Amino acid sequence: MSKVRLLFFIQIILFHSFFGQSVLYSTVNKKAIKYYEKAIVCFNNISVETGKPDIEGTENLLIKSLAKDSTFWEAYSLLSNLNIEKGDIKSAIFFRKKMMFSSNSVPIIEYYYLASMQIAVGNYKECLTNAKRYQQSPLADKRFMTKINRMIQNSLFALNAIKNPVNFKPINLGPSINSELPEYFPSITADDSTFLFTRRVNDISVSMGRQEDIFVSKRDENNDWSNSTLISDVINSDFNEGAPTFSSDGQYIIFVGCETGAKGDYEYGNGRKGYGSCDLFYSQNNGQKWSNPVNLGPPINSKHWETQPSFSSDGKTLYFVRGMTYNRERRNPNNQDIYFSSILDDGTWSKPKKISSNINTPYREESVQIHPDGKTLYFASNGHPGMGGLDIYMSRMQEDESWSSPVNLGYPLNSFMDENSILISPNGDLGYFSSDREGGYGSLDLYSFKVEEKFKPLPITYLKGKVIDAETKTPLTAYFQLSNLEKGNVISQMQSKIGNGEFLITVPNNIDFALHAEKEGYMFYSKNIYVDSINLSEDGFLIIELEKIKSGTFVLENIFFEKSESDLKQSSIVELNKVLKLMSINPEIKIEISGHTDSDGDNNLNLQLSINRAKAVVNWLIENNISSDRLFFKGYGETRPIEDNNSLLNKAKNRRTELTIIEK
């Protein structure tokens, strides 16, 4: 049981047991009362050095009290509370039960306390019995009814989940990742090659003697994780840094930095400043090293607690957890929700909004991951029907962009303990989580497990490659867009890496899309790709050669027509807009649009079709304010094939629309 929950139980139990009762005890034995009242004083005598009560002294006095009267239920109650303070919940339950059997005058509220402890250790059957007893009592305090109803709901869910367990066989990630120190909050790149996580390290230079840092590991030649190392001295400091999230290509990292709270200076380590509590920062890898982290600023960060970010693979949306704080020193763990913010056209962040009420509850949500498929959300919560503590859930974005009702990932992945730090691999086969279960290297370790089919994200793959200058072959930093041709919307956008020109873009399956690469002074690159069950990553590295704007001919791969017609399909708009942009920012150039067909059918019909198709493109550009004296069109029919017309694939390549810069 977590320390937070222990303290919660202590507060409510002590209040009702000690101050809610009359001074008239259930016993008339004066010696029993004397020992009991001494025990109360002893229990409330908090040590200045340890911050804890005199547990041993209190326990001895209570044993003496019960020796004088074994039906003195108040003494059993305090003895139960004492074991909560010791962290021994099972013994606390034992003495609570003895209290119940010792007297008929035990208040009904004690059934509420007993049920609270029983669900906290996974004793669901007895919790259900005692919770229902309290629920059905006419003396029940209505203020506790919401919590009692949740205990009943969770107990029923848990009993059913235990009868129908999911396949779950966790495997420790081993000493290259784990240590005797706690490891948690993992993140991974879309190509499954780089792994980030948080480790709480010992540090005698800080007041608490420990702080959090971010570590990194990469796949080696055997596909195993290499020995983890600190990610960078620029990112890590002697303050807390953790809960990192990668952009899909690993070029950007967003992480949490927390201030000390000392002297009101909002210091976040390495000279960084913030807005209070924990803030989100970002850093970019330029191919050689990480840049100095920058605070994301308002409206993302606030005086409250921002943490556990997850960056969408399309580079558009950031999901994170915000916890409301009472003040700089105190945070309410039960007022904690998932928010999201999107990058606007001007490059700023939109005002964060709470994600759907289907996901957020009046209780606690955390450990959010938006999968690279962009549609599947994994998170932890104690507000949905579950096993009693924080459980892991999955929700899917619907066609109308609403979120489905969360699905619990089941027992034994979820248990009466708190589960979080969930991460599902890009291909959906493996899940990662943090646990302090037996057999680890000490404290919290990171584990992997096979994800059941029903909990997997939507299938995706990735496109990996490099952008170079067509003539010099030097790497280029280019801007990328991945567009859905059917809907005409941008699916993903990013730029190739500074220094080496490499890129990695996640690609949804079963979508016909256009890939465009642009750089000022260069002709845009266009490619049409359809992804089905084939993993693009298996096809190797895609080398994109950008040519400087000059006289030359380029294939427009994403111009489409109805079969044997010259009517432009709606899916051509993405490409047409790229040509429009080229003409608009380069007013000095003139172009010829040429149409080509394969060799099927009549030669004359093919020639006329190619002319009409080229003319259709020119007419669209004229309708969009490009001067007609800069535009020319011509049809070549089947006379200029680029491949032999001996296969369906080659014929498709020959059916094309080309753009030729004829004057610059």
Task: Give the residues covered by each predicted segment.
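Periplasmic OmpA-like peptidoglycan-binding domain that tethers envelope proteins to the cell wall
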Residues: 381, 385-388, 594-664
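Short, acidic Ser/Thr/Gly-rich low-complexity loop/linker segments typical of extracellular
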Residues: 486-502
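Short, solvent-exposed beta-strand/turn patches at coil↔beta or beta↔helix junctions
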Residues: 548-589, 597-605
